[in-house]
Swiss-Prot record:
Protein name, entry field: Small ribosomal subunit protein uS4B
Database matches in Gene3D superfamilies: Ribosomal Protein S4 Delta 41, Chain A, domain 1, RNA-binding S4 domain
GO molecular function list: rRNA binding; structural constituent of ribosome
Domain S4 RNA-binding: 96-156
Transferase in keyword set: no
Function: One of the primary rRNA binding proteins, it binds directly to 16S rRNA where it nucleates assembly of the body of the 30S subunit.
PROSITE patterns: RIBOSOMAL_S4 (PS00632), S4 (PS50889)
GO cellular component: small ribosomal subunit
Family designation: Belongs to the universal ribosomal protein uS4 family.
Single biological process term from Gene Ontology: ribosomal small subunit biogenesis
Gene: rpsD2
Taxon lineage: Bacteria, Pseudomonadati, Pseudomonadota, Gammaproteobacteria, Alteromonadales
Length: 206
């Protein structure tokens, strides 16, 4: 599946936030001023219309989870079909992606690295190899690193970084065995307050 291959820090500067969570690996400020827009001196950010705010929020979340436009729209359509709050459904679908769950469990330092682990067949779901980053993980699914991949230094480094932050309450992880359980779907209160999913729903509802 296609994915964005351009400069990621530029996207983070455009959205004004660390989209790819590289600050967990190294200080992103050491590479660029995250609060400044792209450009030699950082272009002045214009005041946005309601539509502009909605579009920026959609782009921010889409890029954060590494999803292209068509797939992101499909996630919205699916979330609208499900019972309950559409915005919360959308975030749960994104959080349930295998590459994201691998990241949440700490096996990858970033979502991009976690996606690569999945694509390179380093991840097992309930004992079977799954190499589709968008695979939908369900409650009680067991996620593990394949035996022959456990010696990869980047996985050990990622787990070391993950050990410095709080493990999400909706997963349980055994770092020694390099496996974890997706215990439940995250609730809205579990997720980042920096995301305003209502703006995305308003955008797609037009």
């Amino acid at each position: 599946m296609a994915r964005y291959l351009g400069p990621k820090l530029k996207l983070s500067r455009r959205e004004g936030t660390d989209l790819f969570l590289k600050s967990g690996v190294r200080a992103i400020e050491s590479k660029c001023k995250i609060d400044n827009a792209p450009g030699v001196h950082g272009a002045r950010k214009p005041r946005l219309s309601d539509y502009g705010l909605q579009l920026r929020e959609k782009q921010k979340v889409r890029r954060m989870y590494g999803v292209l436009e068509k797939q992101f729209r499909n996630y919205y359509k699916e979330s609208a079909r499900l019972q309950g709050n559409t915005g919360e459904n959308l975030l749960q679908l994104l959080e349930g992606r295998l590459d994201n769950v691998v990241y949440r469990m700490g096996f990858g330092a970033t979502r991009a690295e976690s996606r690569q682990l999945v694509s390179h067949k380093a991840v097992l779901v309930n004992g079977k190899v799954v190499n589709i980053p968008s695979f939908n993980v369900k409650a009680s699914d067991v996620i593990a690193i394949r035996e022959k991949a456990k010696k990869q230094s980047r996985i050990g480094a990622a787990l070391e970084i993950a050990g410095q932050r709080e493990v999400p309450t909706w997963v349980s992880v055994d770092a020694t065995k390099m496996e974890g359980i997706f215990t439940r779907q995250p609730e809205r209160s579990d997720l980042s307050a920096e995301i305003n999913e209502q703006l995305i729903i308003e955008l797609y509802s037009k």
